[in-house]
Structures are given as structure tokens and as C-alpha cells.
Amino acid sequence: QRSLVGSEMCIRDRNISVLFLWAMSAIAFDSPGKVSPKVINEEVWAAYDGFNSTFLDPGKCIYKTDSSFESAVDRHNGAAAIWCQPIYWDMAMNAYKLAEAQKDKARKKTMKALCDDIFAGNKAHYANFDFDDNNENTGWFIYDDIMWWTITLARAYELFGDREYLKLSEVSFARVWYGSDKVGDSGSYDKENGGMFWQWQPIRNPAPNKFGDGKMACINFPTVVAALTLYNNVPERRKQSSESTPKYQTKAQYLEKGREIYAWGVENLMDKKTGRIADSRHGNGSPAWKAHVYNQASFIGASVLLYKATGEKSYLDNAILAADYTFNTMSSEQKILPFERGIEQGIYTAIFAQYIAMLVYDCGQTQYIPYLERTINCGWANRDQTRNVCSGEYDKPLQPGMVVDSYSASGIPALMLLFPIF
């Protein structure tokens, strides 16, 4: 395996480090003010089981929009958003890794079956992962919807070694970067001015993207995460494709693409003094400086992956700056992660969990553990105890039986799976 760059900053054995980090967090929050009782290991699994019992359609093995639906029929009738489904698959893979770390063979087997079922269910529902199918119900019609899947498919390959996952991840990356002959779009990548466009329009018979069209953080930094995750997993000596729109890249090409898009993002979407990430920029206009947790998250993940690949400390510094902004400016006075009420925005904490874990575990930034623990304990204490389901407003009780969406409910179990006590 590739040697870890910057290893003096890294915690190599994640399984050993978890207990130490949580012990340190207990000391850090032995301070004035009310602190909820600590979550124990059994509750981690109760939270994840409660989430799945409430939101996973057992027949289709995809997730529902909210608890009011009996099943996940389609986009307009009970199925959670296409771009959020891979975040739920990430949670299942994290559950598998946790069971493995705990040497719980029975639960590990169950979680592996769940991971397989979620992939199969989503493949069946979403056009057999034909990324050139742009129907607006079960197809692909926004660039970032595809790229979130690119990332998780690459992670699934990294964990399980199934080559179908890698093939789909690379094909989807290429589809976003270069566009689709079938759909007729020109691709997300702006070869003239850099960065990634968010969408093609119209969805049917699209016109080429032009200067001034939106370049959102939610496509740019996930593109970096995808490129670097693929960089970590494709063969070392792969030959460069001779096709004008190749279906795969070499390791060097993935790294180059990741570095290029990241550099564009830093120049156009990052406040270098504070670590705030803008939501978007259109042409030479001022960035839209509304900060969202998932944009902070994907920027942190992109920064960590580039730091590990190159050893360049500026990437790590950027990740820390963005994390500090999330906790010190965006979060509550108690450093509890914020909740946003927009459509699907409840998923932001689950995305943040994935990437702050990389900063904590891979780069030894343990200072964030107490704040994550505070969010977990607060959210779990306010759960609906009949279903073991949490809401996204972590400091407010969720009443028994109240309708709650899967996006908002995902945050606490996602954090618990990555920051458990065992």
C-alpha cells in the first residue's frame, strides 16, 4: 500500500484511536453547563436500527423521504432524493466498518448484506446506473447528483473490492466531466475558465454552459473528493486512454484534476481569512457567501485528501480553518451543529460527519471531538424514544410519532457510527 504522506500528523490505527479520542472528549467537556448523559455502544446500534426501521423501504432497499410514507415509490411519492441515497449507503458502510472493528461477526455479516442490498436497490431504481438517462423521476439530470454517487461508489470499491463499483464510479466521473453524447450537454468542467458548472439546461436538448452560469461549491469540492478517492484506488501503472472523452483516468490525471478544481475553488469560493465556503459563484460576480455545512464538509474532505496525497501543509491548514469556522461561527453557542430547514438540507450533518472524521482520524485533529460529542449527546437525548429516531433540531425533543424526514434524522446516527464509544 502507498505510504501515508505527513504521517507525523496522522493516527494510523483508527480502531485503537477511537477510545482514546472519546476519553479525551469526556475530559474536555467536564465544564459548567448541562451536559447530556453519554451515549453508550448499544445506543449507537439502536440509533442506526431505528433509522433503518423508520426510513428504509424493505422491499426496494432505498430510503424514504419521511416517516409518513409506507414505501419509496419514486421521486414524487416517497423516495428520498437521488443525491442523498449514497449518503445513506455511506452510513451502512460505516456501520459495517464499526461492526468489524468491534469484532462482531454476526452484525458485520448483517451490515454487509445491508450494503449489498442498498446498492442493488438503488441500481434497480435509478435507471440501472445509466448516467446518460436524464429522465426527471428516476434518472440523472444535475451534475452534483451524479458526483455524490461517484464518491460513494469509489468508497465502496475501496472497502469491498467489487470492480463493478469502481467501473461505475469512473464512468460517472467521466460523464460529469465531459458531458454525454446521448443527453447533449457539454459537461460540467469549464475548460476555458476553470471550475465545474452545476447543471445543464434545458434538461432535454441542453445548450452549452456559458460564462456566467453557476458554479456551485456542491459540485466543485465533491469533484475533488471523487478525483482523489479514485486516485487512491486505481492501478499505479494504468495507461492513459487515447479517447477524446475517456471513460477512465490514470492516477496522475485524477490527482491533476483534483488539484486544479480545488485551486479554482479556493480562489473563487473560499474566504481565506475565515474558512467560510461560498455556496456559488456566477462569472465574475461576487460569490454567494451563504455558508452551508455540507459545503464546509466537502471542502474539508477535499483538503484532507489532497494533504494526504501530497504532504502539502497548506491543504491541512485550509481543512482546519474550514472546520473552525463551522464550529465557531456556524454552530450554536454550545458548539452544536446547526440545522437548516430547506428541502433536503437536513442531510448536511451526515455529510459533515463523513469528512470531519477524516480530519480527526487521518490528521490527528482531536480538538473537534468534544463538539461532536456535544451534538451527539444533545440530539440523542431529544430523540423519539419509541422509534429511536432523532430530528435535525438537536436541542428540541422529537415528539413520539411526529413525522420526520430521513434527511434530518440521519445526522445523529451518522455521527454516532463514526464517533462511537466501544
Label for each model-derived stretch:
Residues 140-153, 160-172, 176, 214-217:
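Mobile, glycine-rich extracellular loop/lid and propeptide segments
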Residues 166-260, 264:
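Aromatic- and glycine-enriched pocket-lining scaffold segments that form the walls
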Residues 221-222, 226-290, 297, 302-305, ...:
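Noncatalytic carbohydrate-binding groove/subsite architecture in carbohydrate-active enzymes
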Residues 23-34:
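Bacterial Sec-dependent signal peptides at the C-terminal "C-region" and cleavage site
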Residues 12-22:
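Sec-dependent signal peptide recognition
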Residues 33-144, 159, 179, 186-187, ...:
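CBM-like carbohydrate-recognition segments
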